[in-house]
Amino acid sequence: LDTSILSTDVARLTKLGATVVIPATQVGDVTWFAVLADPQGNAFSLFSRSTSERFEERVEVGEDYIVQAAAKPARGSMAWFEVGTTDHKATQSFYTRAFGWRFEFDDTAGGKQYYNIFTGKEWPSGGMYDLGADGADYLIPSFLVGDVPEVNELAESLGAVVEFGPDTNPDGLVYSRILDPNGNRFTVFSTPGM
């Protein structure tokens, strides 16, 4: 397995302010990965491509899922990601320089300081929420659901805490942020007409 690309990316990202949480680590004959944290402390992972047959099988399944999710995400699937930040300028600068992401203010968010994140396609695949100095920094997955209040009740019955929501944007999108019993944050959302 060639780790030179992964090592180059880790070195480049640390020069931009990221810190290494888990150094480059081999996963059998499948791949190498590293876990870094952005300047706000949010963890993210990098993976290297491999010529391993098992890696190619996993990539094929993953890419099929991404194509399906991009066309029409299924309920319960990860359909978005969100970066919550106490310093939107620093966060935007890091991810723009690190990965070439583009940020555009979301006029449909009802006056919230929310930016759509474009990771290379014409449609956004995530968002950045400027929470101000009193907020909390996070980088979390967002799952598409049919009924946000119902999912909130279920999550609470299983020991989770609904940190925020449900709230509704002017365009009808309903969302909540949840902290599971193990301390993992995620959001759930539904869209109009589901």
Spans of features found by a protein language model:
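Core segments of cupin and vicinal oxygen chelate
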Residues: 15, 27-31, 82-124, 150, ...
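Short glycine-enriched loop/turn motifs at secondary-structure junctions
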Residues: 28, 74-77, 133-138, 170
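N-terminal beta-strand motif that seeds the catalytic metal site of vicinal oxygen chelate
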Residues: 3, 47-93, 101-104, 138-143, ...
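Short, well-ordered, mixed-charge alpha-helical segments that flank or form enzyme active sites
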Residues: 31, 43, 53-55
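Structural motif
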Residues: 78, 123-126, 138-140, 173
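Conserved short beta-strand elements that form part of the metal-binding/catalytic scaffold
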Residues: 43-50, 101-137, 181, 185-191
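Vicinal oxygen chelate
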Residues: 1-40, 87-89, 142-185
